[in-house]
Protein backbone atom coordinates (compact mmCIF):
# COMPACT_ATOMS: atom_id res chain seq x y z
CA UNK A 1 0.00 0.00 0.00
CA UNK A 2 3.01 2.30 0.20
CA UNK A 3 2.73 3.36 -3.42
CA UNK A 4 -0.89 4.49 -3.19
CA UNK A 5 -1.79 8.16 -2.94
CA UNK A 6 -2.94 9.61 0.41
CA UNK A 7 -6.51 10.18 -0.78
CA UNK A 8 -6.99 6.55 -1.72
CA UNK A 9 -5.39 5.42 1.52
CA UNK A 10 -7.66 7.57 3.67
CA UNK A 11 -10.70 6.47 1.68
CA UNK A 12 -9.74 2.83 2.06
CA UNK A 13 -9.37 3.04 5.82
CA UNK A 14 -12.98 4.20 6.08
CA UNK A 15 -14.50 1.45 3.94
CA UNK A 16 -15.68 -1.25 6.37
CA UNK A 17 -13.77 -4.52 6.15
CA UNK A 18 -15.57 -7.84 5.83
CA UNK A 19 -15.15 -10.82 8.14
CA UNK A 20 -17.23 -13.70 6.75
CA UNK A 21 -15.28 -16.00 4.47
CA UNK A 22 -18.04 -17.47 2.32
CA UNK A 23 -18.71 -18.04 -1.37
CA UNK A 24 -21.92 -18.23 -3.38
CA UNK A 25 -22.59 -21.86 -2.45
CA UNK A 26 -22.25 -21.45 1.32
CA UNK A 27 -25.91 -20.79 2.14
CA UNK A 28 -26.43 -18.79 5.32
CA UNK A 29 -22.78 -17.77 5.48
CA UNK A 30 -23.07 -16.31 1.98
CA UNK A 31 -26.13 -14.33 3.08
CA UNK A 32 -24.09 -12.95 5.95
CA UNK A 33 -21.29 -12.09 3.55
CA UNK A 34 -23.76 -10.30 1.29
CA UNK A 35 -24.95 -8.21 4.22
CA UNK A 36 -21.39 -7.16 4.91
CA UNK A 37 -20.90 -6.40 1.21
CA UNK A 38 -23.95 -4.15 1.19
CA UNK A 39 -22.82 -2.32 4.33
CA UNK A 40 -19.41 -1.79 2.79
CA UNK A 41 -20.88 -0.51 -0.48
CA UNK A 42 -23.38 1.74 1.30
CA UNK A 43 -20.63 3.28 3.40
CA UNK A 44 -18.38 3.80 0.38
CA UNK A 45 -21.17 5.32 -1.72
CA UNK A 46 -22.20 7.66 1.08
CA UNK A 47 -18.59 8.70 1.55
CA UNK A 48 -18.23 9.46 -2.15
CA UNK A 49 -21.41 11.52 -2.21
CA UNK A 50 -20.44 13.56 0.85
CA UNK A 51 -17.04 14.24 -0.74
CA UNK A 52 -18.65 15.23 -4.03
CA UNK A 53 -16.73 12.33 -5.59
CA UNK A 54 -19.59 10.11 -6.72
CA UNK A 55 -18.41 7.87 -9.57
CA UNK A 56 -20.32 4.59 -9.74
CA UNK A 57 -23.65 2.80 -9.37
CA UNK A 58 -23.75 -0.91 -8.57
CA UNK A 59 -26.40 -3.39 -7.49
CA UNK A 60 -27.04 -7.13 -7.59
CA UNK A 61 -29.09 -8.14 -10.62
CA UNK A 62 -30.12 -11.56 -9.29
CA UNK A 63 -31.44 -12.72 -5.90
CA UNK A 64 -28.41 -14.92 -5.21
CA UNK A 65 -26.11 -11.90 -5.40
CA UNK A 66 -23.77 -13.57 -7.89
CA UNK A 67 -24.32 -11.13 -10.77
CA UNK A 68 -23.78 -7.40 -10.34
CA UNK A 69 -24.43 -4.62 -12.82
CA UNK A 70 -24.27 -0.85 -12.77
CA UNK A 71 -22.43 2.10 -14.22
CA UNK A 72 -19.21 3.94 -13.58
CA UNK A 73 -17.87 7.16 -14.96
CA UNK A 74 -14.72 9.21 -15.17
CA UNK A 75 -14.39 12.96 -15.68
CA UNK A 76 -11.58 13.95 -18.05
CA UNK A 77 -11.07 17.53 -19.24
CA UNK A 78 -14.44 18.49 -17.75
CA UNK A 79 -16.22 15.82 -19.80
CA UNK A 80 -17.95 12.85 -18.17
CA UNK A 81 -17.32 9.45 -19.75
CA UNK A 82 -19.80 6.84 -18.52
CA UNK A 83 -19.61 3.07 -19.03
CA UNK A 84 -21.67 0.02 -18.19
CA UNK A 85 -20.09 -2.00 -15.39
CA UNK A 86 -20.78 -5.67 -14.72
CA UNK A 87 -19.18 -8.71 -13.09
CA UNK A 88 -19.88 -12.21 -11.82
CA UNK A 89 -18.93 -13.40 -8.36
CA UNK A 90 -16.55 -16.32 -9.03
CA UNK A 91 -17.22 -19.72 -7.51
CA UNK A 92 -14.06 -19.48 -5.41
CA UNK A 93 -14.84 -15.99 -4.06
CA UNK A 94 -13.45 -14.51 -1.83
CA UNK A 95 -10.24 -16.50 -2.43
CA UNK A 96 -10.30 -15.00 -5.93
CA UNK A 97 -11.38 -11.50 -6.86
CA UNK A 98 -14.31 -10.74 -9.17
CA UNK A 99 -13.46 -9.94 -12.80
CA UNK A 100 -14.72 -6.42 -13.43
CA UNK A 101 -16.05 -5.90 -16.96
CA UNK A 102 -16.56 -2.77 -19.06
CA UNK A 103 -18.08 -4.33 -22.20
CA UNK A 104 -18.29 -1.06 -24.12
CA UNK A 105 -14.49 -0.75 -24.19
CA UNK A 106 -13.90 -4.38 -25.19
CA UNK A 107 -11.20 -4.63 -27.85
CA UNK A 108 -10.14 -0.99 -27.65
CA UNK A 109 -7.23 -1.35 -25.25
CA UNK A 110 -4.58 -3.93 -24.56
CA UNK A 111 -5.18 -3.49 -20.82
CA UNK A 112 -8.21 -5.72 -21.16
CA UNK A 113 -9.15 -9.33 -21.69
CA UNK A 114 -11.93 -10.71 -23.87
CA UNK A 115 -15.38 -9.51 -22.87
CA UNK A 116 -14.11 -6.23 -21.45
CA UNK A 117 -12.49 -7.68 -18.35
CA UNK A 118 -10.04 -5.09 -17.08
CA UNK A 119 -6.55 -6.25 -16.21
CA UNK A 120 -5.99 -6.07 -12.45
CA UNK A 121 -3.20 -8.60 -12.23
CA UNK A 122 -0.47 -6.20 -11.21
CA UNK A 123 -2.00 -3.40 -9.19
CA UNK A 124 -4.92 -5.05 -7.42
CA UNK A 125 -4.99 -8.84 -7.31
CA UNK A 126 -1.86 -9.13 -5.12
CA UNK A 127 -3.55 -6.78 -2.65
CA UNK A 128 -6.70 -8.88 -2.77
CA UNK A 129 -4.72 -12.05 -2.09
CA UNK A 130 -3.07 -10.45 0.93
CA UNK A 131 -6.35 -9.17 2.34
CA UNK A 132 -8.67 -12.11 1.75
CA UNK A 133 -11.39 -12.28 3.11
CA UNK A 134 -11.37 -8.71 4.44
CA UNK A 135 -11.71 -7.05 1.04
CA UNK A 136 -15.01 -7.04 -0.80
CA UNK A 137 -16.76 -5.51 -3.78
CA UNK A 138 -16.36 -1.97 -2.49
CA UNK A 139 -12.62 -2.48 -2.15
CA UNK A 140 -12.42 -3.99 -5.63
CA UNK A 141 -14.06 -0.86 -7.00
CA UNK A 142 -11.95 1.55 -4.93
CA UNK A 143 -8.56 -0.11 -5.47
CA UNK A 144 -9.14 -1.94 -8.74
CA UNK A 145 -11.55 -0.11 -10.99
CA UNK A 146 -10.94 3.49 -9.95
CA UNK A 147 -7.17 3.41 -10.61
CA UNK A 148 -7.75 1.56 -13.88
CA UNK A 149 -10.14 4.25 -15.09
CA UNK A 150 -7.80 7.02 -13.95
CA UNK A 151 -4.89 5.45 -15.82
CA UNK A 152 -6.59 4.25 -19.00
CA UNK A 153 -9.48 6.58 -19.86
CA UNK A 154 -7.29 9.63 -20.58
CA UNK A 155 -5.11 7.53 -22.87
CA UNK A 156 -8.11 6.07 -24.67
CA UNK A 157 -9.72 9.49 -25.11
CA UNK A 158 -6.52 11.12 -26.35
CA UNK A 159 -5.91 8.30 -28.82
CA UNK A 160 -9.46 8.56 -30.13
CA UNK A 161 -10.48 5.05 -29.11
CA UNK A 162 -13.23 6.53 -26.94
CA UNK A 163 -15.37 9.47 -27.95
CA UNK A 164 -17.64 11.49 -25.73
CA UNK A 165 -21.30 11.09 -26.66
CA UNK A 166 -21.50 14.77 -27.63
CA UNK A 167 -18.51 14.41 -29.95
CA UNK A 168 -20.01 11.23 -31.38
CA UNK A 169 -23.30 13.03 -32.03
CA UNK A 170 -21.46 15.90 -33.71
CA UNK A 171 -19.52 13.59 -36.01
CA UNK A 172 -22.74 11.72 -36.81
CA UNK A 173 -24.45 14.94 -37.87
CA UNK A 174 -21.56 16.12 -40.05
CA UNK B 1 -24.10 -36.85 -48.14
CA UNK B 2 -23.96 -36.33 -51.89
CA UNK B 3 -27.25 -38.18 -52.26
CA UNK B 4 -28.77 -35.74 -49.81
CA UNK B 5 -27.50 -32.78 -51.81
CA UNK B 6 -28.89 -34.25 -55.04
CA UNK B 7 -32.29 -34.71 -53.39
CA UNK B 8 -32.15 -31.10 -52.23
CA UNK B 9 -31.49 -29.90 -55.77
CA UNK B 10 -34.45 -31.93 -57.07
CA UNK B 11 -36.68 -30.40 -54.42
CA UNK B 12 -35.53 -26.96 -55.48
CA UNK B 13 -36.49 -27.71 -59.09
CA UNK B 14 -40.02 -28.60 -58.01
CA UNK B 15 -40.25 -25.48 -55.86
CA UNK B 16 -39.02 -23.25 -58.66
CA UNK B 17 -41.87 -24.32 -60.96
CA UNK B 18 -44.51 -23.74 -58.30
CA UNK B 19 -43.36 -20.23 -57.36
CA UNK B 20 -43.66 -17.06 -59.38
CA UNK B 21 -40.41 -15.45 -58.20
CA UNK B 22 -37.40 -17.67 -59.03
CA UNK B 23 -34.70 -15.30 -57.71
CA UNK B 24 -34.69 -16.71 -54.19
CA UNK B 25 -34.78 -20.27 -55.46
CA UNK B 26 -31.80 -19.63 -57.71
CA UNK B 27 -29.93 -18.20 -54.76
CA UNK B 28 -30.69 -21.30 -52.72
CA UNK B 29 -29.68 -23.54 -55.61
CA UNK B 30 -26.27 -21.91 -55.97
CA UNK B 31 -25.79 -22.20 -52.22
CA UNK B 32 -26.54 -25.93 -52.28
CA UNK B 33 -24.29 -26.46 -55.31
CA UNK B 34 -21.52 -24.66 -53.45
CA UNK B 35 -21.98 -26.92 -50.43
CA UNK B 36 -21.99 -30.00 -52.67
CA UNK B 37 -18.72 -28.87 -54.24
CA UNK B 38 -17.22 -28.33 -50.79
CA UNK B 39 -18.28 -31.77 -49.63
CA UNK B 40 -16.55 -33.35 -52.63
CA UNK B 41 -13.34 -31.53 -51.76
CA UNK B 42 -13.41 -32.89 -48.23
CA UNK B 43 -11.53 -36.18 -47.92
CA UNK B 44 -13.66 -39.00 -46.64
CA UNK B 45 -13.31 -39.72 -42.94
CA UNK B 46 -12.21 -43.26 -42.17
CA UNK B 47 -14.66 -45.65 -40.55
CA UNK B 48 -14.42 -46.41 -36.87
CA UNK B 49 -12.16 -49.15 -35.60
CA UNK B 50 -13.99 -51.60 -33.34
CA UNK B 51 -10.99 -53.37 -31.85
CA UNK B 52 -7.38 -52.31 -31.71
CA UNK B 53 -5.14 -54.50 -33.80
CA UNK B 54 -1.38 -54.89 -33.68
CA UNK B 55 -1.24 -55.93 -37.34
CA UNK B 56 1.51 -54.00 -39.10
CA UNK B 57 -0.19 -52.61 -42.21
CA UNK B 58 -0.37 -49.08 -43.58
CA UNK B 59 -4.10 -48.87 -43.03
CA UNK B 60 -4.01 -49.67 -39.30
CA UNK B 61 -3.94 -46.37 -37.37
CA UNK B 62 -3.04 -48.15 -34.13
CA UNK B 63 -0.21 -50.40 -35.27
CA UNK B 64 2.55 -48.22 -33.84
CA UNK B 65 0.69 -47.67 -30.58
CA UNK B 66 0.08 -51.38 -30.03
CA UNK B 67 3.80 -51.94 -30.61
CA UNK B 68 4.29 -50.50 -27.12
CA UNK B 69 2.61 -53.64 -25.85
CA UNK B 70 4.73 -55.95 -27.96
CA UNK B 71 7.89 -54.22 -26.73
CA UNK B 72 6.89 -54.68 -23.13
CA UNK B 73 6.42 -51.01 -22.23
CA UNK B 74 2.66 -51.22 -21.64
CA UNK B 75 0.84 -54.33 -20.43
CA UNK B 76 -2.47 -53.67 -22.14
CA UNK B 77 -2.59 -50.69 -24.46
CA UNK B 78 -6.21 -51.35 -25.44
CA UNK B 79 -7.27 -50.06 -22.02
CA UNK B 80 -6.69 -46.57 -23.44
CA UNK B 81 -10.19 -46.80 -24.91
CA UNK B 82 -11.80 -47.08 -21.47
CA UNK B 83 -10.41 -43.79 -20.19
CA UNK B 84 -12.06 -40.38 -20.04
CA UNK B 85 -9.92 -37.26 -19.73
CA UNK B 86 -11.20 -33.72 -19.17
CA UNK B 87 -9.10 -30.84 -20.50
CA UNK B 88 -9.84 -27.38 -19.10
CA UNK B 89 -8.54 -24.62 -21.34
CA UNK B 90 -8.01 -25.35 -25.04
CA UNK B 91 -5.14 -22.92 -25.49
CA UNK B 92 -1.50 -23.33 -26.35
CA UNK B 93 -1.05 -26.30 -24.03
CA UNK B 94 -4.58 -27.73 -23.84
CA UNK B 95 -5.19 -27.94 -27.59
CA UNK B 96 -1.90 -29.74 -28.18
CA UNK B 97 -2.59 -32.09 -25.26
CA UNK B 98 -6.02 -32.84 -26.72
CA UNK B 99 -4.49 -33.66 -30.09
CA UNK B 100 -1.87 -35.92 -28.50
CA UNK B 101 -4.49 -37.85 -26.56
CA UNK B 102 -6.70 -38.12 -29.63
CA UNK B 103 -3.86 -39.59 -31.65
CA UNK B 104 -3.18 -42.03 -28.80
CA UNK B 105 -6.75 -43.30 -29.14
CA UNK B 106 -8.13 -42.09 -25.79
CA UNK B 107 -11.71 -43.23 -25.19
CA UNK B 108 -13.34 -39.90 -24.42
CA UNK B 109 -12.31 -36.25 -24.17
CA UNK B 110 -14.19 -33.45 -22.42
CA UNK B 111 -13.08 -29.99 -23.59
CA UNK B 112 -13.77 -26.73 -21.73
CA UNK B 113 -13.07 -23.20 -22.97
CA UNK B 114 -14.97 -19.97 -23.52
CA UNK B 115 -12.55 -18.21 -25.86
CA UNK B 116 -12.54 -17.90 -29.66
CA UNK B 117 -9.76 -18.57 -32.14
CA UNK B 118 -7.96 -15.45 -33.35
CA UNK B 119 -5.01 -14.79 -35.61
CA UNK B 120 -2.95 -13.98 -32.52
CA UNK B 121 -3.15 -17.70 -31.67
CA UNK B 122 -1.28 -18.69 -34.83
CA UNK B 123 2.06 -18.40 -33.04
CA UNK B 124 1.21 -21.70 -31.34
CA UNK B 125 0.28 -25.17 -32.54
CA UNK B 126 -3.05 -26.76 -33.46
CA UNK B 127 -5.49 -24.05 -34.59
CA UNK B 128 -5.50 -22.90 -38.22
CA UNK B 129 -6.19 -19.49 -39.78
CA UNK B 130 -9.40 -20.72 -41.41
CA UNK B 131 -10.77 -21.41 -37.92
CA UNK B 132 -10.49 -17.77 -36.80
CA UNK B 133 -13.78 -16.66 -35.29
CA UNK B 134 -14.90 -20.12 -34.23
CA UNK B 135 -15.05 -20.97 -30.56
CA UNK B 136 -11.98 -22.92 -29.52
CA UNK B 137 -14.13 -25.85 -28.46
CA UNK B 138 -15.91 -26.08 -31.82
CA UNK B 139 -12.66 -25.71 -33.76
CA UNK B 140 -11.00 -28.36 -31.60
CA UNK B 141 -13.83 -30.86 -32.08
CA UNK B 142 -13.76 -30.22 -35.83
CA UNK B 143 -10.06 -31.01 -36.10
CA UNK B 144 -9.90 -33.86 -33.59
CA UNK B 145 -12.88 -35.71 -35.10
CA UNK B 146 -11.04 -35.80 -38.41
CA UNK B 147 -7.81 -37.03 -36.82
CA UNK B 148 -9.45 -39.92 -34.97
CA UNK B 149 -13.22 -40.58 -35.25
CA UNK B 150 -12.94 -43.33 -32.60
CA UNK B 151 -12.62 -40.77 -29.80
CA UNK B 152 -15.82 -39.60 -28.10
CA UNK B 153 -15.64 -35.78 -27.96
CA UNK B 154 -17.71 -33.59 -25.65
CA UNK B 155 -17.20 -29.84 -25.68
CA UNK B 156 -18.41 -27.17 -23.25
CA UNK B 157 -18.17 -23.52 -24.31
CA UNK B 158 -18.40 -21.79 -20.94
CA UNK B 159 -16.55 -20.11 -18.10
CA UNK B 160 -16.07 -22.56 -15.22
CA UNK B 161 -15.38 -19.81 -12.67
CA UNK B 162 -19.00 -18.64 -12.60
CA UNK B 163 -21.57 -20.38 -10.42
CA UNK B 164 -23.51 -21.74 -13.38
CA UNK B 165 -20.38 -22.79 -15.25
CA UNK B 166 -18.97 -24.49 -12.18
CA UNK B 167 -22.13 -26.56 -11.73
CA UNK B 168 -22.05 -27.66 -15.36
CA UNK B 169 -18.37 -28.48 -14.96
CA UNK B 170 -18.80 -30.64 -11.86
CA UNK B 171 -21.88 -32.43 -13.18
CA UNK B 172 -20.15 -33.25 -16.46
CA UNK B 173 -17.18 -34.65 -14.53
CA UNK B 174 -19.47 -37.00 -12.60
CA UNK B 175 -21.44 -38.14 -15.65
CA UNK B 176 -20.76 -41.87 -16.01
CA UNK B 177 -22.68 -42.58 -19.22
CA UNK B 178 -19.48 -43.37 -21.12
CA UNK B 179 -18.36 -46.26 -18.90
CA UNK B 180 -21.11 -47.08 -16.36
CA UNK B 181 -19.47 -50.24 -15.03
CA UNK B 182 -16.46 -48.37 -13.70
CA UNK B 183 -16.29 -48.16 -9.92
CA UNK B 184 -15.81 -44.91 -8.07
CA UNK B 185 -17.82 -41.72 -8.05
CA UNK B 186 -16.20 -39.86 -10.92
CA UNK B 187 -17.02 -40.16 -14.59
CA UNK B 188 -13.54 -39.18 -15.75
CA UNK B 189 -10.20 -40.76 -14.97
CA UNK B 190 -8.14 -37.58 -15.04
CA UNK B 191 -8.58 -33.82 -15.32
CA UNK B 192 -5.91 -31.74 -17.06
CA UNK B 193 -5.80 -28.06 -16.16
CA UNK B 194 -4.34 -26.10 -19.09
CA UNK B 195 -5.68 -22.67 -18.16
CA UNK B 196 -3.63 -19.50 -18.04
CA UNK B 197 -5.03 -17.68 -15.01
CA UNK B 198 -5.19 -18.08 -11.26
CA UNK B 199 -8.98 -17.88 -10.95
CA UNK B 200 -9.62 -20.80 -13.29
CA UNK B 201 -6.98 -22.93 -11.57
CA UNK B 202 -8.66 -22.26 -8.24
CA UNK B 203 -12.01 -23.31 -9.72
CA UNK B 204 -10.56 -26.60 -11.01
CA UNK B 205 -8.89 -27.11 -7.64
CA UNK B 206 -12.19 -26.60 -5.82
CA UNK B 207 -14.05 -29.02 -8.08
CA UNK B 208 -11.42 -31.76 -7.85
CA UNK B 209 -11.05 -31.43 -4.08
CA UNK B 210 -14.79 -31.84 -3.66
CA UNK B 211 -15.04 -34.77 -6.08
CA UNK B 212 -11.87 -36.55 -4.87
CA UNK B 213 -10.71 -36.25 -8.47
CA UNK B 214 -7.07 -36.74 -9.41
CA UNK B 215 -5.88 -34.00 -11.75
CA UNK B 216 -2.78 -32.52 -13.31
CA UNK B 217 -1.99 -28.85 -13.47
CA UNK B 218 0.23 -27.19 -16.05
CA UNK B 219 1.64 -23.74 -16.50
CA UNK B 220 3.94 -21.76 -18.75
CA UNK B 221 5.80 -18.66 -17.57
CA UNK B 222 4.89 -15.23 -18.86
CA UNK B 223 8.24 -14.90 -20.60
CA UNK B 224 7.57 -18.16 -22.47
CA UNK B 225 10.84 -19.87 -21.59
CA UNK B 226 9.82 -22.16 -18.73
CA UNK B 227 6.91 -24.27 -17.57
CA UNK B 228 5.83 -27.07 -15.29
CA UNK B 229 3.37 -29.89 -14.75
CA UNK B 230 2.09 -31.13 -11.41
CA UNK B 231 0.10 -34.17 -10.25
CA UNK B 232 -2.54 -33.38 -7.63
CA UNK B 233 -4.23 -36.19 -5.67
CA UNK B 234 -6.68 -34.62 -3.18
CA UNK B 235 -5.59 -35.34 0.39
CA UNK B 236 -2.33 -37.01 -0.62
CA UNK B 237 -0.48 -34.19 -2.37
CA UNK B 238 -0.66 -30.44 -1.99
CA UNK B 239 -3.72 -28.87 -3.60
CA UNK B 240 -3.44 -25.63 -5.53
CA UNK B 241 -4.54 -23.59 -2.51
CA UNK B 242 -2.20 -25.33 -0.02
CA UNK B 243 0.59 -22.87 -0.70
CA UNK B 244 -0.47 -19.23 -0.49
CA UNK B 245 0.14 -17.08 -3.57
CA UNK B 246 3.78 -16.03 -3.86
CA UNK B 247 2.96 -12.39 -3.23
CA UNK B 248 1.40 -13.29 0.13
CA UNK B 249 3.99 -15.85 1.21
CA UNK B 250 7.05 -13.81 0.36
CA UNK B 251 5.81 -10.40 1.42
CA UNK B 252 6.88 -9.04 -1.95
CA UNK B 253 5.89 -5.44 -2.50
CA UNK B 254 3.28 -5.59 -5.25
CA UNK B 255 4.77 -2.50 -6.86
CA UNK B 256 7.68 -4.63 -8.03
CA UNK B 257 5.34 -6.82 -10.08
CA UNK B 258 5.65 -4.61 -13.12
CA UNK B 259 4.15 -5.44 -16.45
CA UNK B 260 3.58 -3.33 -19.55
CA UNK B 261 0.28 -4.15 -21.22
CA UNK B 262 -1.53 -7.42 -20.67
CA UNK B 263 -0.18 -9.69 -23.38
CA UNK B 264 2.07 -12.46 -22.08
CA UNK B 265 4.74 -13.87 -24.38
CA UNK B 266 4.32 -17.38 -25.73
CA UNK B 267 6.25 -19.76 -27.95
CA UNK B 268 4.91 -22.84 -29.70
CA UNK B 269 8.05 -24.66 -28.55
CA UNK B 270 7.63 -24.14 -24.82
CA UNK B 271 3.90 -24.78 -25.06
CA UNK B 272 4.54 -27.95 -27.04
CA UNK B 273 7.12 -29.26 -24.57
CA UNK B 274 4.84 -28.64 -21.59
CA UNK B 275 1.94 -30.30 -23.40
CA UNK B 276 4.20 -33.25 -24.18
CA UNK B 277 5.33 -33.61 -20.58
CA UNK B 278 1.72 -33.35 -19.40
CA UNK B 279 0.37 -36.01 -21.75
CA UNK B 280 3.34 -38.31 -21.15
CA UNK B 281 2.69 -38.10 -17.41
CA UNK B 282 -1.01 -38.71 -18.07
CA UNK B 283 -0.33 -41.81 -20.17
CA UNK B 284 1.99 -43.20 -17.49
CA UNK B 285 -0.69 -42.55 -14.88
CA UNK B 286 -3.50 -44.12 -16.91
CA UNK B 287 -1.64 -47.10 -18.40
CA UNK B 288 0.67 -47.79 -15.45
CA UNK B 289 4.10 -47.65 -16.98
CA UNK B 290 7.22 -45.77 -15.96
CA UNK B 291 7.19 -43.41 -13.00
CA UNK B 292 4.53 -40.70 -12.68
CA UNK B 293 6.17 -37.41 -11.67
CA UNK B 294 4.50 -35.51 -8.83
CA UNK B 295 6.04 -32.32 -10.20
CA UNK B 296 8.21 -31.74 -13.24
CA UNK B 297 9.57 -28.35 -14.23
CA UNK B 298 11.14 -27.29 -17.50
CA UNK B 299 13.63 -24.43 -17.73
CA UNK B 300 14.48 -24.06 -21.40
CA UNK B 301 17.24 -21.48 -20.91
CA UNK B 302 19.35 -24.11 -19.15
CA UNK B 303 17.52 -27.28 -20.22
CA UNK B 304 16.91 -28.03 -16.56
CA UNK B 305 14.09 -30.40 -15.50
CA UNK B 306 13.58 -30.17 -11.71
CA UNK B 307 11.28 -32.63 -9.93
CA UNK B 308 9.92 -32.56 -6.40
CA UNK B 309 7.08 -33.76 -4.22
CA UNK B 310 4.75 -31.44 -2.33
CA UNK B 311 2.80 -32.57 0.72
CA UNK B 312 -0.58 -31.03 1.57
CA UNK B 313 -0.78 -28.15 4.03
CA UNK B 314 -2.49 -29.19 7.31
CA UNK B 315 -3.77 -25.62 7.55
CA UNK B 316 -4.92 -25.27 3.94
CA UNK B 317 -7.49 -22.54 3.38
CA UNK B 318 -9.59 -24.93 1.27
CA UNK B 319 -12.11 -26.81 3.43
CA UNK B 320 -12.52 -29.65 0.94
CA UNK B 321 -8.75 -30.18 0.95
CA UNK B 322 -8.74 -30.55 4.74
CA UNK B 323 -11.49 -33.16 4.48
CA UNK B 324 -9.53 -35.13 1.90
CA UNK B 325 -6.42 -34.97 4.09
CA UNK B 326 -8.42 -36.37 6.99
CA UNK B 327 -9.73 -39.20 4.81
CA UNK B 328 -6.20 -39.92 3.68
CA UNK B 329 -5.02 -40.13 7.29
CA UNK B 330 -7.94 -42.38 8.24
CA UNK B 331 -7.06 -44.74 5.40
CA UNK B 332 -3.47 -44.96 6.64
CA UNK B 333 -3.93 -48.31 8.50
CA UNK B 334 -5.19 -49.93 5.30
CA UNK B 335 -2.22 -48.63 3.32
CA UNK B 336 0.16 -49.76 6.07
CA UNK B 337 -1.44 -53.21 6.07
CA UNK B 338 -1.07 -53.43 2.31
CA UNK B 339 2.56 -52.36 2.53
CA UNK B 340 3.15 -54.88 5.32
CA UNK B 341 1.56 -57.68 3.30
CA UNK B 342 3.83 -56.80 0.42
CA UNK B 343 6.82 -56.83 2.75
CA UNK B 344 5.82 -60.23 4.11
CA UNK B 345 5.53 -61.57 0.59
CA UNK B 346 9.03 -60.31 -0.12
CA UNK B 347 10.22 -61.72 3.22
CA UNK B 348 8.77 -65.15 2.48
CA UNK B 349 10.69 -65.14 -0.77
CA UNK B 350 13.82 -64.30 1.17
CA UNK B 351 13.15 -66.96 3.80
CA UNK B 352 12.95 -69.63 1.13
CA UNK B 353 16.60 -69.08 0.48
CA UNK B 354 17.36 -70.20 4.05
CA UNK B 355 20.26 -69.10 6.24
CA UNK B 356 23.52 -68.32 4.50
CA UNK B 357 25.56 -70.27 7.06
CA UNK B 358 24.71 -73.72 8.39
CA UNK B 359 26.36 -73.08 11.75
CA UNK B 360 26.23 -70.01 14.00
CA UNK B 361 29.15 -70.52 16.36
CA UNK B 362 28.85 -67.13 18.08
CA UNK B 363 25.03 -67.05 18.17
CA UNK B 364 24.82 -63.78 16.26
CA UNK B 365 21.23 -62.82 15.28
CA UNK B 366 19.65 -59.91 13.42
CA UNK B 367 17.14 -58.06 15.62
CA UNK B 368 13.93 -56.70 14.10
CA UNK B 369 13.80 -52.90 14.44
CA UNK B 370 9.97 -52.74 14.51
CA UNK B 371 9.96 -50.70 17.71
CA UNK B 372 12.13 -48.07 16.09
CA UNK B 373 9.70 -47.90 13.16
CA UNK B 374 6.80 -47.39 15.53
CA UNK B 375 8.67 -44.48 17.09
CA UNK B 376 9.26 -43.02 13.65
CA UNK B 377 5.60 -43.36 12.76
CA UNK B 378 4.54 -41.64 15.98
CA UNK B 379 6.92 -38.79 15.24
CA UNK B 380 5.67 -38.35 11.69
CA UNK B 381 2.02 -38.53 12.72
CA UNK B 382 2.53 -35.65 15.13
CA UNK B 383 3.77 -33.51 12.22
CA UNK B 384 7.19 -33.08 13.77
CA UNK B 385 9.68 -31.90 11.20
CA UNK B 386 12.83 -33.89 10.51
CA UNK B 387 15.91 -32.64 12.32
CA UNK B 388 17.55 -29.65 10.68
CA UNK B 389 14.42 -28.35 8.98
CA UNK B 390 12.36 -25.35 10.05
CA UNK B 391 9.00 -24.06 8.88
CA UNK B 392 9.20 -21.22 6.37
CA UNK B 393 5.66 -19.92 6.78
CA UNK B 394 3.95 -18.91 10.03
CA UNK B 395 1.16 -21.03 11.46
CA UNK B 396 -2.38 -19.75 11.01
CA UNK B 397 -3.32 -19.42 14.70
CA UNK B 398 -2.96 -15.67 14.86
CA UNK B 399 -5.13 -15.25 11.77
CA UNK B 400 -7.85 -17.46 13.21
CA UNK B 401 -7.85 -15.52 16.48
CA UNK B 402 -8.35 -12.30 14.55
CA UNK B 403 -11.27 -13.88 12.73
CA UNK B 404 -12.78 -15.05 16.01
CA UNK B 405 -12.65 -11.53 17.42
CA UNK B 406 -14.22 -10.12 14.27
CA UNK B 407 -16.94 -12.75 14.13
CA UNK B 408 -17.75 -11.93 17.76
CA UNK B 409 -18.61 -8.39 16.78
CA UNK B 410 -20.36 -9.81 13.73
CA UNK B 411 -23.08 -11.38 15.83
CA UNK B 412 -24.58 -7.96 16.47
CA UNK B 413 -25.04 -7.54 12.74
CA UNK B 414 -27.14 -10.69 12.54
CA UNK B 415 -30.25 -8.63 13.19
CA UNK B 416 -29.82 -6.61 9.99
CA UNK B 417 -32.00 -7.71 7.13
CA UNK B 418 -30.55 -8.37 3.68
CA UNK B 419 -33.53 -6.82 1.91
CA UNK B 420 -33.27 -3.64 3.96
CA UNK B 421 -29.61 -3.27 3.06
CA UNK B 422 -30.42 -3.87 -0.59
CA UNK B 423 -33.07 -1.15 -0.53
CA UNK B 424 -30.67 1.26 1.15
CA UNK B 425 -28.13 0.76 -1.62
CA UNK B 426 -30.81 1.18 -4.29
CA UNK B 427 -31.92 4.41 -2.65
CA UNK B 428 -28.34 5.67 -2.67
CA UNK B 429 -28.02 4.70 -6.33
CA UNK B 430 -31.15 6.66 -7.19
CA UNK B 431 -30.01 9.79 -5.33
From Swiss-Prot, chain A:
Q: Where is the active site?
A: 119
The answer to whether the entry has keyword Lyase is: no
Q: Which Gene3D superfamilies match?
A: Ubiquitin Conjugating Enzyme
Superkingdom of origin: Eukaryota
| Keyword Amino-acid biosynthesis appears in the UniProt entry | no
Show the GO MF annotations. Answer: UFM1 conjugating enzyme activity
Q: Print the keywords alphabetically.
A: Ubl conjugation pathway
Instruction: State any GO BP term from the record.
Output: protein ufmylation
> Mind telling me which Pfam families this protein's record contains?
UFC1
Q: What family does the entry list?
A: Belongs to the ubiquitin-conjugating enzyme family. UFC1 subfamily.
The task this protein performs is described as:
E2-like enzyme which forms an intermediate with UFM1 via a thioester linkage.
Q: What is this protein called?
A: Ubiquitin-fold modifier-conjugating enzyme 1
Q: Identify the species of origin.
A: Arabidopsis thaliana (Mouse-ear cress)
Curated annotation (Swiss-Prot), chain B:
Which residues are annotated as active site? 263
Q: Which Pfam families match?
A: ThiF (PF00899)
User: InterPro entries, from UniProt?
Assistant: D-isomer_DH_CS1, ThiF/MoeB/HesA, ThiF_NAD_FAD-bd, Ubiquitin-activating_enz
Q: Which UniProt keywords apply?
A: ATP-binding, Metal-binding, Nucleotide-binding, Ubl conjugation pathway, Zinc
Please tell me where Zn(2+) binds in this chain: 239, 242, 316, 321
Indicate which residues the UniProt annotation says bind ATP: 92, 113, 136, 159, 197
Say if the entry is tagged with keyword ATP-binding: yes
Specify the domain of life of the species encoding this protein: Eukaryota
The ranges of region (Disordered) come to: 339-396
A molecular-function term among this protein's GO annotations: ATP binding
State its role.
Answer: E1-like enzyme which activates UFM1.
| Family membership noted in the UniProt record | Belongs to the ubiquitin-activating E1 family. UBA5 subfamily.
Q: What is this protein called?
A: Ubiquitin-like modifier-activating enzyme 5
Organism this protein belongs to:
Arabidopsis thaliana (Mouse-ear cress)
